[in-house]
Structure formats: C-alpha cells, structure tokens
C-alpha cells in the first residue's frame, strides 16, 4: 500500500496528510462532508465558537457510528443464526441419506 502526500482543505485550513492512494478521494469527500456538517450546525444553533460547534458535530457523528455498529452487530447475529440453522439442516439431510 503506497502512500501519497495529499493536501486537504478542512474548515478553511490546509492539512497535509499521507494517505493510501486508493483512499484519497474518500478523504476529500469526508472533508467536504465535515465542512457541510459544521456549516449546517452553525446555522442551526447560531453558535460561532468553532470548538463548541465541532464538539456537537463530533458527538453527533459518534452517536451515528454507534447506531451503525449496533445495526451491524444485529445483522451479523441474524446471519450467524441463519448459517447455523442451515448447517444443522444440511447435517440432518446428510445423516438421513447415509446408508445404514
């Protein structure tokens, strides 16, 4: 995995980061998304203190991430249960078809 030095504009500041080449566009998209979220939060709350706005945006993003992790865990459990049931059914079929 080769890295590329990339300049990203985030909240009006240029950040220079070493990024895997295949992730450059995703990082740029994430930076644009962060700018939008901060602008929307400033507009919504009327706050002008960047640190407070960033704290709220970070908390919202953290909450969304937690929700997605919980959803993923539930889906994984459903899939695991389904696979176990299929394995059990296949084993029953195999045992039933074995000559005695």
Curated annotation (Swiss-Prot):
Coiled-coil intervals, chain numbering: 21-45
Domain of life: Bacteria
Keywords recorded for this protein, A-Z: Cell cycle, Cell division, Coiled coil, Cytoplasm, Septation
Cell compartment(s), UniProt: Cytoplasm
Entry keyword Zinc: no
Cross-referenced Pfam families: ZapA
GO BP: division septum assembly; FtsZ-dependent cytokinesis; septin ring assembly
Keyword match Kinase: no
One Gene Ontology cellular component annotation held by this UniProt entry: cell division site
Transmembrane segments: none
Family, similarity comment: Belongs to the ZapA family. Type 1 subfamily.
Binding partners and assembly: Homodimer. Interacts with FtsZ.
Function: Activator of cell division through the inhibition of FtsZ GTPase activity, therefore promoting FtsZ assembly into bundles of protofilaments necessary for the formation of the division Z ring. It is recruited early at mid-cell but it is not essential for cell division.
Annotated PANTHER family: CELL DIVISION PROTEIN ZAPA
Name the UniProt record assigns to this protein: Cell division protein ZapA
């Amino acid at each position: 995995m080769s890295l590329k030095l990339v300049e990203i504009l985030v909240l009006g500041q240029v950040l220079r980061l070493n990024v895997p080449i295949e992730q450059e566009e995703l990082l740029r998209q994430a930076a644009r998304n962060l700018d939008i979220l901060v602008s929307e939060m400033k507009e919504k709350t009327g706050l002008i203190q960047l640190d407070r706005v960033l704290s709220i945006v970070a908390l919202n993003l953290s909450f969304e991430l937690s929700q997605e992790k919980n959803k993923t865990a539930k889906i994984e459990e459903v899939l695991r249960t389904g696979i176990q049931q299929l394995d059990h059914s296949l084993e029953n079929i195999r045992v039933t078809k074995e000559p005695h």
